[in-house]
Design a protein with these regions (language model features):
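Core segments of cupin and vicinal oxygen chelate
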Residues: 2-5, 9-50
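Short hydrophobic/aromatic beta-strand element in the GNAT-like acyltransferase core
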Residues: 40, 73, 106-108
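A short, structured beta-strand/loop element
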Residues: 50-57
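Mid-chain, well-packed structural core segment of small domains
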Residues: 65-92
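Vicinal oxygen chelate
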Residues: 3, 10, 34, 83-127
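Short glycine-enriched loop/turn motifs at secondary-structure junctions
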Residues: 1-4, 64-69, 101
Length: 127
């Protein structure tokens, strides 16, 4: 399929803090990739987990300003559980669980690095 998002990078200031946050919230796995301040993100912690993105230091940016980036939404099975994990792992909830009618439930939060992240529990009966 053409024009499909195939990778994302979450820009970070502290690699270990960000790794701990995303492990605690989404239970993702991580691989070193030969660069300091850069980790591949895997969809799970298995040896063969699908590579879906990266944590990377803001210094890899080609622009001098602090990168803010895209608003990415991560599909989850249980949004209430994810919201609790965000709170318990140092994130800041910006938008509590909110219905998007006929689509699902969304919450928005800042991670420990100040990035805006969305989590969505898809449910066409949401009202």
């Amino acid at each position: 399929m053409s024009n499909k998002l195939t990778h994302f990078a979450i820009h970070i200031d502290d690699i270990e803090r960000a790794k701990s946050f995303y492990d605690g919230v989404f239970d993702w796995g991580f691989n070193s990739y030969g660069q300091a301040d850069f980790l591949q993100i895997k969809a799970d912690k298995s040896e063969t987990g699908e590579l879906i993105g990266a944590l990377q230091a803001r210094k890899f940016s080609p622009v001098s300003e602090k990168l803010i980036g895209l608003e990415c939404t991560i599909g989850v099975e249980n949004l209430d559980e994810i919201v609790e994990r965000v709170k318990n792992n140092g994130g800041q909830l910006l938008l509590p669980k909110t219905a998007i009618p006929y689509v699902g439930w969304i919450a928005k939060f800042l991670d420990t690095e100040g990035n805006l992240i969305c989590a969505m529990q898809y449910d066409n009966s949401a009202r």
